[in-house]
């Protein structure tokens, strides 16, 4: 088995590589076929996914069985001020990878986001819920999903949310750093979603790679909370002496609008390969207990 990992140096790509190199996961045993797979790593410096010819050549030269596309322009506010770039990376980049995969018959695992939804609602959203993004980021990611469907027959579109992990920048590290520096934080308390440990997502992507259970998946931490709730748990588990205060989205203005409610239901996982996603508080606690070891690595 050969896997082409696009975006291997990012938060999720690094977590996938960590599982494979360490030959273990916090969630359980990793299939031998995955551990013994040949992994071709690419990042923004070695593969420009906005260049169709370059993508086609890379895929054709390497002839992977599976392509995992973790590459994206994920700066939500940055997408508002750089809409053309967001479209090139999140939409055309996804299209290019899909076209290349179809040409050689490879499976494509494409990572997407909860921000393809409007935020209207109060119950977890299943994979067939109506999409209606409210930001440039969500719009371009949804276009990417549509291109994947249009141009690749063997696809897994995997939506995740509020991702954090041992590698790279994320909300958990930001809150810890700010908590140490300031001693008092204000965090939005009227947006709900699912904090997701990159370890959990990476583990399930690798499991999907071995199947032909194609389609759209939600893959997020179990349970929902607000960003304020999330921040409070980060401070609690870290032991940092910091006060966390709730504010509204109206009080904390950002260039890009965020969905008020984007909690996802992992229905497809439950009905196909099994849902081993941890409750978000449990996964966060394990992360907080272990993150220093990974930094030292």
Model-found features: residue ranges?
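NAD(P)-dependent short-chain dehydrogenase/reductase
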Residues: 146-193, 199-200
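NAD(P)-cofactor binding segment of oxidoreductase domains
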Residues: 81-109
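NAD(P)H-binding glycine-rich loop region in Rossmannoid oxidoreductase-like domains
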Residues: 49-89
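Amphipathic terminal alpha-helices
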Residues: 280-297
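N-terminal Rossmann NAD(P)H-binding glycine-rich loop of SDR-like oxidoreductase domains
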Residues: 1-26
């Amino acid at each position: 088995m050969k896997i082409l990992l696009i975006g291997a140096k990012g938060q999720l790509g690094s977590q996938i590589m960590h599982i494979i190199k360490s030959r273990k996961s916090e969630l359980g045993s990793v299939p031998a076929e995955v551990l013994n797979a040949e992994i071709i790593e690419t990042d923004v410096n070695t593969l420009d996914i906005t260049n169709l010819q370059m993508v086609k050549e890379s895929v054709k030269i390497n002839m992977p069985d599976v392509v995992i596309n973790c590459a994206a322009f994920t700066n939500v506010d940055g997408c508002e001020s750089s809409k053309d770039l967001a479209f090139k990376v999140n939409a055309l980049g996804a299209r290019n990878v899909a076209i290349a995969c179809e040409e050689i018959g490879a499976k494509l695992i494409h990572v997407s986001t909860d921000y393809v939804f409007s935020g209207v609602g109060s119950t977890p959203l299943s994979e067939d819920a109506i999409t209606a993004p409210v930001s440039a980021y969500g719009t371009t990611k949804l276009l990417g999903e549509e291109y994947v469907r249009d141009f690749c027959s063997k696809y897994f579109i995997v939506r995740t949310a509020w991702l954090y992990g041992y590698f790279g920048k994320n909300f958990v590290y930001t809150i810890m750093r700010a908590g140490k520096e300031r001693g008092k934080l204000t965090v939005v308390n009227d947006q709900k979603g699912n904090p997701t440990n990159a370890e959990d997502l990476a583990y399930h992507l690798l499991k999907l790679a071995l199947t032909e259970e194609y389609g759209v998946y939600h893959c997020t931490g179990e349970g929902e909370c607000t960003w304020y709730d999330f921040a409070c748990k980060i401070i609690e588990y870290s032991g940092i002496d910091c006060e966390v205060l709730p504010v509204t989205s109206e009080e904390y203005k950002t260039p890009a609008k965020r969905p008020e409610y984007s909690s996802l239901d992992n229905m497809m996982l439950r009905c196909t390969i099994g849902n081993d996603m941890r409750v978000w508080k449990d996964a966060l606690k394990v992360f907080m207990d272990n993150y220093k070891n990974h930094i030292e690595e």
